[in-house]
Amino acid sequence: MENRKEFTFPSADGRTAIHAVEWHPAGEPAGILQIAHGVAEYALRYEPFARFLNAHGFLVVANDHLGHGESVAEGAPRLYFGEKGSWQHVVDDMYTLRCRTGEAYPELPYFIMGHSMGSFLTRTYLIHYPGTVKGAILMGTGQNPDAMLVGGKALASVLARKVGRENASDVVEKLAFGAYNKAFAPNRTGYDWLSVSEENVDAYIADPLCGGMASTGLFLELLDGMAFIKKPANLRHMNMATPVLFISGDRDPVGGMGKGVRAAYDSFRRAGVRDAELKLYPGLRHEILNEDCRAQVYDDLWEWIERHNG
């Protein structure tokens, strides 16, 4: 596409070339949105939303996280971040993209949006790199009880020792994602929880860069990240003046059908974030950007960005 530029930059892991995308508006940009995608997907899935923002004068950037899309080192497994602590490499890669883009447009307001796993990464980003964005959108996020995180990590650790961190386990996969689908039985597919839109679910299943079984190592890093962003002592490192929008479907199992999203929102308010908003769409599931009513979601997101772009 004429307005799309693809490039790579070195990952914080020291071995992977991170694939990234820029979508440029027709004229001079009025602002920037950086997107952090979810697990088992990739940056180019966000092109329709990026083009929508381009039409409003925004530059959009996104990268494929380690082990996703085209950010897979030669000989490395897919859906694997790396050794223990590699969650931070993924967050640092997000910051590298932010610096690279910000240096090219230092005067422009810079926003960040994370979906699903990308929302947990973005919450980590807000703790480690406070004050580097004008606003943050947390889409498809959640907050699990400590007991669930501890139990999940114990099981994933045992299975990682059995099959290797870089390999997947169907036990972990079924516990993590199989439970999501139970709320929508009888199931048409294994991914009904993603979307009310059957067209979107089918497109996801047909996409060779989507889905698949994540490594036990990725699950361990994700669980560590989710535990880190829950701790009040860590939340206090955020810039409390940075506005944050929590936005999800109220039938999204990642967000506990809205309960986990509210818990995350409440934790930000308790930490002292002065401008936090919560929006839940009745009946929508995980991928609200890809539902049949996505035009309304796009408009709502733009309204929030525009309101905070002054």
Model-assigned labels for residue ranges:
Residues 48-76:
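Conserved alpha/beta-hydrolase
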Residues 82-103:
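Alpha/beta-hydrolase active-site loop
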